[in-house]
């Protein structure tokens, strides 16, 4: 199945979180937490402005991003892969 985000939405594949602490302790379950870093797999055409123009998104497919998994984030399981649908404003930074 292929998903194409609309408007200012971005599809992100969450990166795996490190399962060891800095001291070498193996973390499991909720102790490991969920990563707030992922790879952009698809983007919408852009945000629709009040005058009807479309402002292209700053992120592109392949960017590694740090995101805020807030109220607007939606998790979807597609082809046995967990993906997040975020708005561009949920993305805090692009990792360069």
Swiss-Prot record:
Q: Which PROSITE patterns match?
A: CHAPERONINS_CPN10
User: Its Gene Ontology molecular function terms?
Assistant: ATP binding; metal ion binding; protein folding chaperone; protein-folding chaperone binding; unfolded protein binding
Chief place where the protein resides: cytoplasm
Where does it localize?
A: Cytoplasm
Q: What SMART domains has UniProt attached to this entry?
A: Cpn10
Q: Which InterPro entries match?
A: Chaperonin_GroES (IPR020818), Chaperonin_GroES_sf (IPR037124), Chaprnonin_Cpn10_CS (IPR018369), GroES-like_sf (IPR011032)
Q: Name one GO cellular component term.
A: cytoplasm
Ranges annotated as spanning the membrane: none
Pfam families annotated for this entry?
Cpn10
A Gene Ontology biological process term: chaperone cofactor-dependent protein refolding
Q: Which CDD domains match?
A: cpn10
* Keyword terms: Chaperone, Cytoplasm
| Homology family | Belongs to the GroES chaperonin family.
Q: What functional role does this protein have?
A: Together with the chaperonin GroEL, plays an essential role in assisting protein folding. The GroEL-GroES system forms a nano-cage that allows encapsulation of the non-native substrate proteins and provides a physical environment optimized to promote and accelerate protein folding. GroES binds to the apical surface of the GroEL ring, thereby capping the opening of the GroEL channel.
| Oligomeric and partner information | Heptamer of 7 subunits arranged in a ring. Interacts with the chaperonin GroEL.
UniProt protein name: Co-chaperonin GroES
Organism, by scientific name, is Buchnera aphidicola subsp. Acyrthosiphon pisum (strain APS)
Q: Which gene encodes it?
A: groES
